[in-house]
Amino acid sequence: MNRSAPSAIAVPGALCLAFLLVACGPPASSPSTTSPAATATSTTTSTTTATKTASASASAETEAGWKSYTTADRLMFDYPADWKITDPAGEAAPGGVFVNITNANGKKLATLRTNMVTGSECTEKQPFGVYESVPVPALQQKGNVPRFTFETRTDTAATDSKLMTLFAYGITSAPEPGGTEACPMFHFFTWPPSGAMFGGVYDPFDATPGNEMHVDTPEAYMGTQEYKSIKKMVTSLRPVA
């Protein structure tokens, strides 16, 4: 497994987020070689359901400085008490949720979406780096345990160094990549009735007030309290008993 980080810098967060939502997936059994880049779709399920009511609620603090949040479709995660939950943050898939989490200064840290259906083809692999990968056993499905990962992909064809490398963290059901190249990031995980995502992007160019000083590499970011809290929040995701 390639765990060394590419030397290129990261793409801005908005482009990273679009990449996470619609641009990637696990390799098809017979990937095409005629297209210069991976293609994918991300659509909501067509199952008809009643309009979701505002049933999501925050519970009492789980530990000092932290709270728990339960979504309308009965998933729960813990988060720092001074962070903000926006639910809904946009149009959710039928029967699913669309939740954004921001810090006290309004910096977007993660998105949780459920009841999503994805499809893709891996037509071109890219150099990659894996900074962290840990299992999330609470989300196990039929013996398959997804994992939280913080990783990167490098587009060697990019002419702008700022657009060369994508940094992102989230939960994935995709196998951990090996060798020197990998398919584009697939930060989705299997969850009934289809799939879900919970993660975000690292942008060293982000200038939100309150950011820690001199943090401009993924290695440095991993040492910040922000990243540690994001990881704790994302890996705390579990179904409500």
Predicted regions and their residues:
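Bacterial N-terminal signal peptides that target proteins for export
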Residues: 2-13
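Bacterial lipoprotein signal-peptidase II cleavage site
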Residues: 6-7, 20-54
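Bacterial N-terminal signal peptides
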Residues: 12-21
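Extracellular/mature segments of secreted proteins
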Residues: 32-33, 129-134, 190-194
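N-terminal low-complexity, Pro/Thr/Ser-rich intrinsically disordered segments
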Residues: 42-75
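Secretory pathway targeting signatures of secreted, lumenal, and periplasmic proteins
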Residues: 72-162, 167-169
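Short, well-structured beta-strand
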Residues: 153-241
